[in-house]
Design a protein with these regions (language model features):
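Conserved beta-sheet core of the metallophosphoesterase superfamily
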Residues: 1-87
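C-terminal/domain-terminus segments
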Residues: 85-97
Length: 97
């Protein structure tokens, strides 16, 4: 299931819907969490983002403790994989995966 935001805990949302859950929008969280019921393994993934944190549109996050994590999530054979964008000290892509 793909959602813009989780309804509470990402794992509780995944289990409630009886499926894995991929969530976007959460700029400061880029992670995968797992849980299991007696019959199924569930994962919930926060997908990172591809924003320009220095643009005016994202000025509201300047003082946030959690900064945006630039990257994407690939789902391969039903498993989520995090692919962070490697940046230099100026915040520019280094040209490598």
């Amino acid at each position: 299931l793909f959602k813009h935001q989780a309804s509470g805990s990402i794992l509780a949302d995944a289990a409630h819907n009886a499926c894995n859950l991929m969530v976007g929008h959460n700029h400061g969280n880029y992670s995968i969490e797992y849980t299991a019921s007696s019959s199924h393994l569930y994962w919930g993934a926060y997908g990172g983002c591809l924003i320009d944190k220095d643009s005016y549109a994202f000025a509201y996050g300047k003082h946030s403790l959690r900064k945006p994590v630039i990257g994407c999530t690939v789902i391969l054979d039903g498993r989520p994989l995090l692919v962070p964008m490697l940046l230099d000290k100026h915040g520019r892509w280094v040209g490598q995966l």
